[in-house]
């Protein structure tokens, strides 16, 4: 059996999967935010409860909203203060007496999609989460790419390409990102960036769902804005597609539910790519909120 944990700032979800990726048991509990020992104890109790439910000792994979840094495996994550700087993987492995694997939750999202029955034949899968920020990951031949520092897939912290300024104006503010840098693309093309950019251009703060509703209703400002936003999205994604040349691009997060993206984006991307480049297949994520636990379980299952 394969246990996948999705650890968030408010909840921890555990999903237990068999070898065919059928979910056979699950449980959700509040996250102990500030006490590391309490968090460890809760995770250990959940693992033992799952063992009792399925009658075997399952393997443990964990997706976290952060980065596992260095060879010692310390976590860097603002959303889980109890784990900041702690070697969670090492501590859990020792206490459970089994191999525990940890990866960024965006990597788990992409891994889950790459192992979907429909998508499994694609060698290179690029995933992007267009949510509050811009997360992502890369899976090659069924395995996630983490990189030396665990930051592969932190695409949101790439800078705006120069041609983006032709689309949204050279006077666009260089927003200071949470990482401390200026001009990171997640501040412009994430779900939050979608709303911020509309407010900057039109002086009116509206939620994304309202902007999209106005767009579908033919409202002039919304039509103009979405046209510019799609060009901006294509300019930013064009760099990623040229860099990784994926067979499949999967989109998740709240903005991925804007279904017109899947019709418009393929018409805007070709001008941002090399003339010989063929577009990847572009799809909405298949597994939604369940992708985190599924991908975490796959951190072990992909070995088989």
Curated annotation (Swiss-Prot):
GO BP terms in the entry: N-acetylglucosamine metabolic process; peptidoglycan turnover
Entry binding sites for ATP: 4-11, 133-140
The protein's annotated pathway: Cell wall biogenesis; peptidoglycan recycling
Keyword RNA-binding assigned: no
Catalysed reactions listed for this entry: N-acetyl-D-glucosamine + ATP = N-acetyl-D-glucosamine 6-phosphate + ADP + H(+)
Cross-referenced Gene3D superfamilies: 3.30.420.40
UniProt-listed Enzyme Commission number(s): 2.7.1.59
Binding site for Zn(2+): 157, 177, 179, 184
Pfam families named among the record's database cross-references: ROK
Keywords assigned by UniProt, alphabetized: ATP-binding, Carbohydrate metabolism, Kinase, Metal-binding, Nucleotide-binding, Transferase, Zinc
Top-level enzyme category: transferase
PANTHER family in UniProt: N-ACETYL-D-GLUCOSAMINE KINASE (PTHR18964:SF162), ROK (REPRESSOR, ORF, KINASE) FAMILY (PTHR18964)
Functional summary from the UniProt entry: Catalyzes the phosphorylation of N-acetyl-D-glucosamine (GlcNAc) derived from cell-wall degradation, yielding GlcNAc-6-P.
Protein family per UniProt: Belongs to the ROK (NagC/XylR) family. NagK subfamily.
NCBIfam families, per database record: PRK13310.1 (NF009835)
Annotated protein name in UniProt: N-acetyl-D-glucosamine kinase
Source organism of this protein record: Pectobacterium atrosepticum (strain SCRI 1043 / ATCC BAA-672) (Erwinia carotovora subsp. atroseptica)
Designated gene of the protein: nagK
